[in-house]
């Protein structure tokens, strides 16, 4: 494999050298002054008028991270730790945002909420998605329950899939081959295969996107240690995205997708019930259909996002399980702009989740909501709103947000001070309430309160710097509690006291000189009261990207994860995990006809030995070679 990498790298370097005289006319500008953000208001507003420090992952950044998973890419952003993203491909993922957990993170795909009612945390599994099908991602941190409802307590991850080309027919192909080895494995054989096909186009008023992707990965065992078997992971993605513009005022979009993952897992076999290298398996299938009509009128629009999701999951182990779940979501909302300063949205969100345990269980949400954004001529901006959560099990709960900011001129850019106070409501999942082994129907709903204060200086390409302090309180946090370790009896319970989390986040982005861009972020998270595992107090990421020519660029990324604690389930005691640092490398070249691109990335260059989860493997130095073809 090393010889293949060396030959590939030499070829691409030669092509890049032939074009080195080209002027870099389109440098990778990190942030533009006219950058538009949507997720925090549902309106396309300039970044300077937003009261949040929103994370945007562009199409260009996604291209530079080919060979990685969507979880790995999101994991490089401030305030976010996606635990399990550096382990075996099929490892379950934990979303830690500002000290929270999976149940407090909401995922949107093309503006439509997605979740799995059968999951413990009612969350969406990012392993189901292929990064090559994604156009861009926006992430807002902090409670956003007013606009997005139950579960949007620490973050909303808004994912937009690839859009149709203006051409009648456009075809793109991608293929990636790579290794998948631990730090102790010197046999760097090709064991990671990732392929994608996308056909799209526009025929007058009709647009279409049809995509297919598959991944097959082996070479690494979930359980760490010697003489362990390889645990394979495979994924199939198919998606279709259709649009029709009936008139200038009315358009309709229809979405459909089928995603399936199969992976070998290691578990806790009888009679000792301690983690070991086993032959367990897991299969998960998701079928999703959505429709999104929109009608525009003078100064406003009426839209609907409606979806049906069917998910089947099966685990084959000493603790076998089969889950069948369905999710229904309808969000109808009216947007209206008063002049050019006041943006309003009024909506109603219906959600129904159902899962089959010993019998079918279900709950519903019926939530009216309203939100307004005021953008003044003198720099004051205000985002405020409220939602009445009407839950079939927990009655009515009012959540609200208040988010002022002040923007002023700063040289050729702007400065901004911001603050926010927001609340959120999180009902226990169907699993936590009704599972026959661990469920507890007497659980109370969780309530969150989030306070933020920060600033942002933005000078366009040259510099963007932001800092933010956050303070979160969790009441009635749902915990998995071991009641009787000797007999392996556990149940979900509510925490007796409040969990209090605070921290700071810093981000910087700068074009050091033409073609050379630098980004970095640092997060400090402190848990004052409560209990969290696998949550580092200190995290940092950095990226140095150099665009050698219009068609060639290279990047080096760095990630630091501080020490943290994890639970050793053989002793039910918490133990400390050491801090670690990872460095990755990327090099890509687009050929002159713009039809072919070759790239290479090397992850964990220095083969750092570390643990994400006690007893589980992590990836060592690995290589990925890939190509993109556009026709």
For the regions a protein language model found, what residue spans apply to each?
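Structural signature of Gram-negative outer-membrane beta-barrels, strongest in the C-terminal barrel
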Residues: 247, 292, 339-345, 351-474, ...
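Outer-membrane beta-barrel signature, preferentially recognizing the C-terminal barrel domain
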Residues: 271-292, 296, 415-475, 481-511, ...
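N-terminal periplasmic "start-of-domain" segments of outer-membrane beta-barrel proteins
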Residues: 35-65, 94
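Outer-membrane beta-barrel translocator/receptor signature
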Residues: 133-135, 149-158, 164-223, 232-238
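Flexible loop and strand-edge segments within Gram-negative outer membrane beta-barrel domains
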Residues: 22, 217-329
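Short acidic/polar hinge/loop motifs at secondary-structure boundaries
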Residues: 113-141
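Extracytoplasmic beta-strand/coil segments of soluble accessory domains associated
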Residues: 71, 75-113
């Amino acid at each position: 494999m090393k010889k293949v990498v060396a030959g590939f790298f030499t070829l691409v370097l030669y092509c890049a050298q032939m074009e080195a005289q080209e002027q870099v006319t389109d440098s990778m500008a990190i942030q533009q002054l006219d950058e538009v953000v949507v997720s925090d208001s549902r309106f396309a507003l300039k970044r300077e008028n937003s009261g949040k420090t929103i994370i945007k992952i562009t199409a260009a950044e996604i291209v530079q991270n080919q060979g990685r998973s969507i979880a790995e890419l999101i994991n490089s952003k401030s305030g976010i730790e996606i635990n399990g993203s550096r382990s075996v491909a099929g490892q379950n993922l934990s979303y830690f945002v500002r000290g929270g957990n999976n149940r407090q993170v909401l995922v949107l795909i093309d503006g439509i909420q997605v979740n799995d009612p059968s999951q413990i945390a009612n969350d969406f599994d990012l392993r189901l998605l292929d990064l090559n099908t994604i156009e861009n991602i926006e992430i807002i941190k902090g409670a956003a329950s007013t606009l997005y409802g139950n579960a949007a307590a620490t973050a909303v991850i808004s994912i937009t899939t690839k859009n149709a080309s203006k051409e009648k027919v456009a075809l793109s192909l991608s293929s990636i081959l790579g290794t998948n080895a631990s730090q102790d494995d010197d046999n760097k054989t090709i064991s990671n295969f990732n392929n994608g096909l996308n056909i799209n186009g526009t025929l007058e008023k009709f647009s279409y996107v049809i995509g297919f992707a598959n991944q097959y990965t082996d070479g690494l065992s979930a359980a760490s240690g010697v003489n362990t078997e390889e645990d394979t992971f495979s994924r199939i993605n198919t998606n279709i995205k259709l649009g029709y513009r009936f008139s200038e005022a009315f358009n309709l979009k229809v979405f459909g997708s089928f995603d399936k993952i199969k992976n070998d897992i290691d578990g806790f076999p009888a009679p000792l019930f301690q983690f070991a290298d086993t032959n367990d398996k897991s299969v998960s299938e998701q079928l999703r259909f959505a429709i999104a009509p929109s009608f525009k009128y003078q100064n406003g629009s009426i839209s609907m996002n409606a979806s049906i999701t069917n998910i089947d999951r099966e685990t084959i182990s000493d603790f076998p399980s089969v889950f069948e779940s369905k999710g229904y979501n309808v969000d109808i909302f009216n947007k209206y702009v008063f002049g050019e300063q006041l943006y309003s949205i009024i909506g109603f969100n219906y959600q129904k989740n159902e899962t089959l345990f010993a019998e079918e269980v279900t709950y519903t949400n019926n939530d009216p909501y309203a939100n307004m954004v005021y953008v003044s001529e003198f720099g004051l901006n205000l985002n405020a709103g409220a939602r009445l959560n009407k839950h079939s099990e927990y009655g009515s709960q009012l959540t609200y947000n208040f988010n002022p900011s002040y923007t002023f001129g700063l040289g050729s850019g702007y400065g901004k001070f911001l603050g926010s106070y927001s609340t959120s409501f999180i009902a226990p999942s169907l699993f936590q309430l009704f599972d026959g082994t661990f469920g507890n129907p007497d659980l109370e709903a969780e309530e969150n309160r989030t306070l933020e204060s920060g600033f942002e200086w933005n000078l366009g390409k040259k510099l963007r710097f932001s800092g933010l302090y956050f303070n979160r309180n969790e009441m009635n946090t749902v915990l998995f509690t071991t009641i009787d370790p000797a007999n392996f009896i556990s149940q979900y319970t509510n925490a007796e006291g409040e969990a209090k989390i605070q921290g700071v986040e810093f981000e910087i982005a700068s074009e050091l000189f033409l073609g050379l861009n630098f980004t970095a972020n640092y997060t400090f998270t402190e848990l004052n009261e409560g209990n969290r595992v696998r949550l580092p107090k200190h995290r940092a990421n950095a990226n140095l990207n150099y665009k050698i020519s219009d068609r060639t660029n290279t990047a080096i990324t760095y990630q630091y994860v501080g020490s943290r604690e994890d639970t050793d389930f053989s002793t039910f005691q918490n133990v400390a995990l050491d801090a670690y640092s990872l460095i990755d490398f990327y090099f890509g070249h687009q050929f002159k006809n713009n039809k072919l691109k070759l790239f290479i990335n090397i992850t964990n260059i220095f083969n750092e030995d570390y643990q994400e989860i006690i007893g589980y493997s992590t990836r060592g130095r690995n290589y990925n070679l890939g190509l993109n073809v556009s026709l």
